[in-house]
Amino acid sequence: MKDKRKVLRPLGSGFAMAVPLFIGILVQDPLISSVGAMGAFSYLAFQHRSLFYNLRAILTHGAALLLAFILGAGTALIPWSAPFIIGALSFSAFLLSKVMRIPKPDYFFVLMLYATGFNFHAAHLGEILHHSSYLLYGIAGSLLAGLVISLAEQLPLKEEKTAFQQLSLHEKYSLALSQQPEMVIKALHFSLILFIATYIAYLLRDSNGYWILISAAAVLAGEHMEKIKNRTIGRVLGGIVGLLLGFLLMSLHMPLEAIAVVLIILNILTEFFMPVNYTVANFFTNPQVLLLMTIGTSFMPLKLIPLRFSGALIGSVLAMLLIFLMDWAVKQMEQALGNKPEDTTDHTQ
């Protein structure tokens, strides 16, 4: 059963992405395919728990992605505010994921959709709402995929509420704080690093600088220093191979139908390898990004590849160095406090 689950979940991810891709082809609207495919990331909230849990989790995740995209696109109208908004968003998302025990990928795709929306240059709010509505195709595909895979896995319709689920929000926060007293400090570190990454992305916004923010957030998802190091190496090495593969695929000048099939296969492979080998998963992530960006646009491969690689490199290395510096500073402070001599002065005189 465990081996079956390893295969079914990635297949569901491919199914979710197939819905907006082929609807876009049928109605001849490339925006449904390109933007709608991002809505399919809402399927990644799927867990091996119950049918109702998955539908609720996918719908909640999808709503968060939609709001994040709208917020990011709205921020682009006032671009200097982006670092402050991402700082507040990442801080609250980190804490919420810990307090509510939201499973991975928790907040990552919310931040990614914010960054993608920030790169979307809209003239007014109406245009933002119109384009963000295309995400609904992917969310609908995710709900359908969640239903099908839940039935295929023979998951129960409902599950009994656990003792944790019956706690109030305040009680959940107190419990999380008692189990992870460093939680708020980590949230501050996380949001500060993304504040800096977003400021750099803002400075490089004419060169797809938002990839710096996405890469920094992806690396920080490791949360622990050793995992962050491994994810940095994996993202850079995997990015090199993935970009070469992406260039090869784009140079074939495939019709839209063939691109859709390739994207579905790449998406399935990404989800299959992500929990197994982060480096290998990045072999398939980068071609997906490049192919999605070419749908309905005039981008050339040679222009996209150096921008994508530089964004991945800068964002990954920046995040690793900053978290290392902050981790070192905290340890130095703890060591200094631990070695502080007791005050033996007699104050009774």
Predicted regions and their residues:
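Alpha-helical transmembrane segments and their membrane-interface boundaries
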Residues: 1-110, 114-283, 290-349
